[in-house]
Amino acid sequence: MDISNFILGVPDFPKKGVLFYDITPLMLNPDAYAQAIDEMAEKIAQANPAKILAAESRGFFFGPMIALKLKLPFVPVRKKNKLPRKTVCVEYALEYGTDLLCIHEDAVSPGDRIAVVDDILATGGTAEAMCKMGEIAGAAVSYTHLRAHETLRHLV
């Protein structure tokens, strides 16, 4: 099955000049969604990561399922003040400013190999921030599905 048939391009959303990729049709089809998870998990497994990181909210559509499929820990990456314990945070650029992404301080250990999962790529800022967070904690980035993007080439 061609998964791209379940991802719809929506022009000028959320603003003029932006092509938004709507993945809800993919998630409405259990067979297509399962295939997408299986294909991503297969690629990520080749990098032999110890943990999967994904950012809220749309990264949570894929990251936890991939982690379960590979029997790996899932590290939720949240915005500032959303995690209850001590955190490691990294500032990242948005189209309209900056924000902070955080993980619990003990979520990633020195020497861990991490895989970074996100749903889409706009500027690459979210994925880059997740990679930097892992590196601050002493981990090595072993996989990001966005590896072809110029912003991230130096991280993998």
Each model region followed by its residue ranges:
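Active-site-facing substrate-recognition patch
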Residues: 1-48
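Short Gly/Thr/Asp-enriched flexible loops that form oxyanion-binding sites at enzyme active sites
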Residues: 61-70
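Short, glycine/charge-rich flexible loops or terminal/linker lids adjacent to PRPP-binding catalytic cores
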Residues: 72-114
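Conserved G/P- and acidic residue-centered "switch" motifs that form tight phosphate/ATP-binding loops
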Residues: 119, 124
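Active-site/ligand-binding-proximal alpha/beta "capping" segment
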Residues: 125-136
